[in-house]
Amino acid sequence: MDITKGSLDEIARPASSSRSRPGSRVSTSLSTEKPKRSSTSLSLEILNPEPGFSEMPSQLCLGLETCETHLEAGRKTPIEHHDQLLGQKHFSKNSAEDYECHRRDEINFDHPFPQKEIDLLSHESEDEFLDLPSAEFEDACENDEDPKDDQDIADDKAIDPKMERAIKRMQALDDILQRKLAKEKEVKAQGLEIRIKLWEELQRATIQSSARSHEENMNTSKFLALTPQLDEMEDAASVQMCNIFSPVFPTQLPNEDPVEDDDHKTLQGNMTGADSSDRSDCKTRHSKGQKKEVDFIQRNIELAKDAGAYILLMDDEKLRLEQLLEDIQEGCSDEDITGDVSGWIVPGEGYTPEPDEYDQLAEIDSRLQMVRCSEESLETSLSDSRILKEVFQEVLLEKNGNSDSAPGEQVLRNTKELRDQKMRLREIDQQLQDMERNSITPMSLVSRYSFSADSPVYA
């Protein structure tokens, strides 16, 4: 390896310092060696390239150089960066040998760092640049060299009409959303105000209810104490009904206990007393009634014995029925009940007419039947004559045409018939009264009645 010495007056700072990373060995060594650099004279040592490095293509070398220029462009002004780009273009026209010479002039100087650290740093930088493709370096160079045209800028600034419509629609929707949000805020504020008012009214109501006087509370408590409970009223009514009505055939065994009468009397006496004593008596009576209830299971067993009978009766009911039937049998026997009616008439008992009187009675009976028949025939003849007379009169009126001249003639006829009937009834009543007064014999009555029947009666 050849070493060439030279001065570093034209170089402001070493190239390796720009690539140093914070925390690395190079940066730490730089911070420790600063006073030494100020005291010693700067020198540059140029080393011959290694055999593998000289065979690299020219494009990769140009890419490495452009990458270095990009890193340094951030620390330079635009004018300095433009001058550097012009120098790079002029330098790209030279061959690879000129590039190697220029590389030696920049790197080969007396550096205060050890040779091992410099070699490690160079290897790391070469590996990083080798990983990057050459196309990226060429695109970067073209972007730096070729400025944008005015037409491209105008195309970028142009806005699609669809985008404009979408933007307008978004703005309209934003306005609607803002209005909805404002309305929602107003509704929430109103709801909060209403809740506050309701809470205030509730507090006022509670204060007013708690501010009632002691006298009002006492009156209400007394009124509620006077009102009886429904269950107690029903119990009292049921007890009274049971005491008033006693069934002939009770379906359950009677409670033969004088305690119930005592309870009923105490109930009537305590109705005028205090309400508290009344309630206590009702409760005790109700509890006693529950204890004295009849066992309905035993009652059902007794009823099941006579399940085939037409009427189900208890043992007590059967005994009572037998007693009643015995009393009836003692009063009258079955023979008297089922005997012939003709046996009731016994000769020598009651009224027994003599044979002459018996013949007279038979004659009277026959004459009465004859009178009845004559009466019926007379009534029928009279009715027929009246009907014929009425028909004859109606026919005459129709012929003469005087029906309209006498409208009340029918009423007069009816009244006359009623008068005649009343006269007959009076005569019959008068005859009966005379019979009762004078005790007229049946024969004279029959003769008189027959005489009156034989006489003509005109309506």
UniProtKB/Swiss-Prot annotation:
Any single Pfam family the record assigns to this protein: FSIP1
Domain of life per record: Eukaryota
Keyword Coiled coil listed: yes
InterPro entries associated with the record: Fsip1
Zinc-finger listed as a keyword: no
Coiled-coil segments: 162-202
Keywords attached to this entry: Coiled coil
Compositional bias (Low complexity): 13-29
Extent of Basic and acidic residues compositional bias: 276-289
Region of interest: Disordered: 1-54, 252-289
Family membership noted in the UniProt record: Belongs to the FSIP1 family.
Protein name in the entry: Fibrous sheath-interacting protein 1
Gene name tied to this protein: fsip1
